[in-house]
């Protein structure tokens, strides 16, 4: 809380998003510390529900997802739905979840989350392609357990993802996330995408 509050009061022009569990208290804290938006973390896979949230079933998952996103939107926060462990979730469950979520709460974006870094780039491409039907901007969040974070991020971009989550030098949880510098240089040199990023600041970062 204090770290995010310090960042939001620093005068930066960047949009600052706070992670939050699917709880009103967390969402209120994000609002209080001045965040532009909130990234709402909710489990989606059967294995996460079984071992981390054993009292939840699919109906509970959907209800909490809709409730938390609707509450964040009510507070005026940009709302990113971050259903973690997306890539190990049952596809029928995801379809039911997303169709209900978009109809009843309509988050500003949906994140596809490869929590344990087990998804091949081709599978990430499939996920993004399939979820485009919901008409909501899509984001990709990868981990590097099998060295696929950057490749999977580019696969998501090719499939139509609007945002790629990255970390400088890939310094994220466990084996890390997609490296900011790899994504930025790949977009410029491999895809020929012009952008206004200050690439000269990569080394200093």
Q: Positions of the model-derived regions?
A:
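Catalytic cores and adjacent flexible loops of soluble metabolic enzymes
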Residues: 1-205
């Amino acid at each position: 809380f204090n770290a995010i509050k310090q960042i939001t009061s620093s005068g930066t022009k960047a949009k600052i998003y706070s992670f939050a569990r699917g709880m009103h208290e967390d969402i209120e804290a994000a609002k209080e510390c001045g965040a532009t938006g909130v990234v709402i973390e909710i489990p989606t896979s059967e294995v996460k529900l079984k071992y981390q949230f054993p009292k939840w079933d699919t109906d509970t998952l959907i209800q909490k997802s809709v409730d938390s996103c609707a509450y964040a939107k009510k507070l005026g926060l940009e709302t990113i739905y971050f259903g973690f462990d997306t890539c190990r979730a049952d596809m029928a469950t995801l379809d039911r979840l997303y169709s209900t979520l978009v109809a009843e709460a309509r988050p500003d974006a949906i994140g596809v989350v490869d929590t344990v870094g087990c998804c091949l780039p081709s599978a990430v491409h499939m996920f993004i392609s399939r979820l485009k039907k919901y008409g909501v901007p899509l984001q990709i969040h990868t981990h590097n357990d099998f060295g696929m974070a950057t490749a999977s991020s580019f696969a998501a971009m090719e499939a139509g993802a609007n945002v790629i989550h990255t970390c400088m030098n890939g310094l994220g949880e466990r084996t890390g996330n997609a490296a900011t510098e790899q994504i930025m240089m790949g977009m410029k040199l491999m895809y020929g995408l012009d952008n206004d990023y200050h690439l000269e600041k990569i080394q200093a970062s």
